[in-house]
Design a protein with these regions (language model features):
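N-terminal secretory signal peptides that target proteins for export/translocation
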Residues: 1-5
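Bacterial N-terminal signal peptides
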Residues: 9-21
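Beta-rich carbohydrate-recognition and catalytic domains
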Residues: 25-148, 154-237
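Intrinsically disordered, low-complexity regions enriched in polar/acidic and amide residues
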Residues: 6, 24-25
Length: 237
């Protein structure tokens, strides 16, 4: 395992070397400098499969697993439940820092069993700091909260901050996508979570993914329990 992790670290270092050629902290990286894609994933719905894994691609279509397909982080160390799901990595605006968010959850305990997410930060994709955000412990009035799912992060250019968004469900209600801004250290959320998107039919929506293209933010999301599928929403103004 020690040799495997060493090879994994070397692979990540080589990938960073390819994507960060001779840049300093004063020179933000632009898209033309990227030569590889990093895909972060988990493999299933059991505790042994709920962990962060890496795969790399040169074309965005064909990926090969790093670290022999084994987890690159110990879920028991970074989470409160012992498992994590739904990993999402975002490269920062300066190109040198990486933010990852994951669901803190053991699905074997039930789909309504989790109340937390984890915020992680790294400069090399290997060594990560982490902070657990338990919604019921962090905020008052969360007694009816049932679950916290699939967080992601996007940079808000108007606010100049990184926005974390995720799905939450309260007893008797639908899954709704909420948001809050992260603090500068990416260790906590600022202020109370607020609804980001509620479908017109007021039904559940989960697994939000925001993509910025041609001056417009596109929110892709999955409907749950009512004509399941992937939908997209854009701002009205």
């Amino acid at each position: 395992m020690r040799n495997t992790m060493r090879h994994f670290a070397v692979a990540i270092s080589l990938m960073l070397a390819m994507t960060l050629p001779s840049f300093s902290q004063q020179h933000p990286i632009v898209e033309k400098d990227y030569v590889a894609y990093l895909f972060t994933y988990f493999t299933g719905n059991h505790i042994s499969e709920e962990a962060v894994c890496y795969a790399v691609s040169m074309d965005g279509y064909t990926y090969w697993a790093l670290n022999d397909g084994k987890p690159v982080l110990d879920s028991k160390v970074i989470s409160s439940t012992g498992s994590v799901r739904d990993p999402h990595i975002l490269r920062s605006q300066d190109g040198h820092t990486f933010y990852m968010v994951v669901t803190d959850m053991v699905s074997d305990n039930g789909w309504d069993s989790n109340r937390a997410m984890v915020l992680l930060k790294s400069n090399d994709l290997v060594n990560w700091t982490h902070s657990i955000i338990n919604m019921q412990k962090r905020y008052k009035g969360q007694e009816k909260l049932k679950r916290v799912w699939a967080p992601q992060t996007v940079f808000d250019p108007e606010a100049g901050k990184y926005m974390v968004y995720w799905s939450m469900q309260y007893a008797g209600g639908a899954d709704i996508i909420y948001y809050a801004y992260a603090n500068d250290d990416f260790t906590d959320l600022i202020g109370e979570p607020k609804p980001l998107f509620i479908p017109e039919n007021k039904k559940s929506c989960i697994d939000g993914d925001i993509v910025y293209k041609d001056g417009v933010f596109h929110l892709f999301y999955k409907t749950e329990g009512h004509g399941n599928g992937i939908k997209v929403a854009t701002p009205r103004s």
